[in-house]
């Protein structure tokens, strides 16, 4: 029970940073804050037994640090997706559920530089469904609640974009 509380408390810090990121304007500030978010979310996953989620968050930190310095190219995206798969391959003890963070990170990494607001929101929705399933499996209730809120805000955003185009 103590690890459940500790893991969820650590994840809460990451979730609060995620909310703060919504107020940041500069890409560099967002990437740095996302590194802090991923550190807390990753440690929360690790405490709760979610090893592949931890690895995905660590690779996301590395990806963000590299993208702060270098241009985001398809070769770099493919490299990070492959790194994600290679590092996670030994941590798939929970079966298909272990693949969800890996697939979510791969999808987001590939689509993160899209110019289409609609496409990005749909990608975020898809990845959040994967993370929600994973977080519920590992009893990360705090992250699950924020996953749902992220999905709702993106659905509202999609609705607003569609009304603007109509």
Q: How would you describe each model-predicted region?
A:
Residues 1-166:
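Alpha-helical membrane-protein topology signature
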């Amino acid at each position: 029970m103590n690890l459940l509380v500790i893991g969820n408390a650590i994840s809460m810090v990451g979730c609060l940073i995620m909310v703060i990121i919504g107020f940041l304007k500069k890409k560099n500030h967002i990437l740095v804050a996302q590194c802090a978010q991923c550190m807390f979310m990753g440690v929360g996953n690790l405490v709760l037994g979610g090893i592949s989620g931890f690895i995905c968050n660590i690779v996301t930190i590395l990806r963000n640090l590299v993208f702060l310095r270098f241009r985001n190219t398809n070769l770099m995206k493919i490299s990070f997706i492959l790194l994600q798969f290679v590092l996670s391959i030994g941590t798939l003890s929970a079966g298909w559920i272990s693949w969800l963070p890996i697939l979510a990170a791969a999808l987001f990494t590939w689509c993160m530089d899209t110019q289409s607001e609609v496409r990005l929101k749909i990608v975020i929705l898809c990845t959040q469904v994967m993370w929600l399933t994973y977080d519920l499996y590992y009893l990360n209730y705090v992250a699950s609640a924020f996953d749902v809120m992220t999905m709702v805000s993106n659905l509202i955003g999609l609705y607003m974009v569609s009304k603007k185009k109509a």
